[in-house]
Amino acid sequence: MKFERVEDLKEYLTQQCFTDTVVLESPSYISAVVGISTDGRLIYSRDLMVRHLCEQDGMTEQEADEFIDFNTEGALPNMGEKAPIIMEDL
């Protein structure tokens, strides 16, 4: 299932009783959501996150990669038990 807007994803999560799931919003990476874990954590594809930043914000792949390293992955420890999972694509 793909979502166009963060609000639609949040509504779906609420309907599925995942009310405490952390959703990345700034940037949303909505196009990078690939699933949800059994413990209610959203799973994002790192490759799709990079692509999202390149397409939406005009970053180069290197800039997007560095942005994700510092700003997104660096913030995960502060997001609690339901912090998203960033999956490395094989």
Residue ranges and their predicted role:
Residues 2-90:
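C-terminal alpha-helical interaction appendages
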